[in-house]
Amino acid sequence: HFAVATLPPARSPPSPAMRVLAVLTSGAVLASAIRTRRDDDPCECLNWQQVYKRNGAKCGDGHELSFVLRTGMVDWLARLMYNVEFCYNFFMRIDDNPCVNMVMDNQPGEWYNNQWCYVAKECPTATSLNTSSLLGAKICEPGKDNMLRDKTPFELREMAKEHDLSIGLLMKMAYPVEGEAKWPAVEALFRNDSAIALAAVNASTLARLHYLQSTGAGYVLDSEKGRAPFGVIKGGKTYLIEKDEVNRQE
C-alpha cells in the first residue's frame, strides 16, 4: 500500500519542492538513526509503552492532550473524547522513546511549539506531574534527543508500520501543522506548475508556502477537516498523506 509518483517534466523547471510527490500510507522502508544517551541519565526520554505499563503514568498526565486542552477544553472531557484515538491507538503503542509535538500547530517562538517526552523526576529540566511521583515531562533538545521532527517522511512511515500507528497522526505529531498554507489551497501547484495553477493561489498563501519550502524543515499542509488526504513538505520534496487502509485510524 505504498506508491511513489514522480511528477512529469514541466514546461518550465519547477521549484525544488515540486519535483517529487510521494504517496505515503504504509510499508517498509529505511530504518532511522537514533541518538543515544547513557542509561543512567535522568533526562533520557523514556519508552512510551513503559511509562504507562510500569511507571504509573496515565495518558494525559503529560502533554498528550495539550493540543485540545490549549483550546479551553476541560481535562476530563479531553480524556473522554480523545482517549481511544490518541492514547490507546497512538501513545500506548509506541515501543520507543521519541519526542513528539506538544500541539498540532505552527507557532514558532511559543513554548508549546516544541516536542516533549517523559523522563525521570530527577531530570533538572523536567516539570513535575501531579499524578506521578516517579516521572516528569521535559521539552526536548534538538541534536540531543530522539525527535520525530528530525525524521524523514519515509522514516516515519517505517515507524508507523512497526508500531501499528496511523501515519496521518504520526506526521502531525512529528512536524508543525501549518494553518495558513493548507493543502486544498496549494495542491494544484504540486501537480501542475502552470500559470493557471499559480494564479489560483492567493499571494499571501503563496508567500507563506515559499517561506516554508525555503526552510527545508518538515511541515504538514493540513486539509480543511484535519483528516487525510493532506500534504507534507520536507527537504525540497512533497508527500501526499492518504487515508490509511491498513490502519483505519485516519
Segments (PLM) and residue ranges:
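Cleavable N-terminal signal peptides of Sec/SRP-targeted secreted and luminal proteins
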Residues: 19-33
